[in-house]
């Protein structure tokens, strides 16, 4: 495999990747006038922006070993799972909500896609800087609801996305299973959650729906990074996404009412979107007994624990008490006695108000 980076990706396009260059409709002369810049999109892939005199695009290539302090590996062909999800999302979301795939190099585990405006902002950076815009959370709630609703009961999507191997390698194992093994006090609820999660086949689940993968442009938010997509438990997306928002709230505890507002707005809009008749069967079951909502709360707790005790830990909870507060909060949620997500969100708000 030709491993690309910002220093050699143009050489790739001039040699083994020349067919990709041609598929992009670019001439040989444009190659010498092009530039390449590596983008900071997570730990599992190499992502490079290429600017040519004609157009800009992004190159993405998977890596077997992820860039984390603790050893973490995943299969290279997960990159094609991302291509599949991108193509499916083109049919479920408004134009421009996700990038369009432009070309694929199967031999080198690489594909190209549309580039986002160069002056975009990453929503994660805004949140870390203390900028809390609930309208972004509202837009994203609508998008996630459209994905979950639109893929429910779709046999073609279910068959295409049924395999959960990458989801296990990049989420269940390093997030849930690792914490269960290293923090025995959480082993029983986490192992139970793993079992129940793998048994669900409800809809398309992104499993990496987070602020770091939301790029803010003048035309609205654009969502990226889909290699963990699969047909499974929608509660994981809810818990994963809200875990990021609530961890940022812990960081900005001195402004808790403003910091927690996007989480409240997201849940309110998402729940409202899926309550429109006819609603997905898995949500209707949740009305009779709050299985979906309760399991979403468990995912919230498990994902927050994973970011303080798992293989991929946040680096922005810098006060010594913050990880312990997260653990105590999650321990409470994993008891199973909370049936409503807003109760869990408000519980954290009250804990932080007491600091």
Question: Predicted segment positions?
Answer:
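Active-site catalytic-loop/activation-segment of kinase and kinase-like phosphoryl-transfer enzymes
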Residues: 1-11, 114, 147-196
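ATP-binding pocket architecture of kinase catalytic cores
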Residues: 39, 44-155
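Alpha-helical scaffolds flanking conserved acidic
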Residues: 292-302
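Active-site Asp-x-Gly
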Residues: 68-78, 204, 217-265, 320-324
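ATP/Mg2+ or Mg2+-diphosphate-binding catalytic cores
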Residues: 254-257, 303-355
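Juxta-kinase regulatory segment immediately upstream of eukaryotic protein kinase catalytic domains
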Residues: 1-34
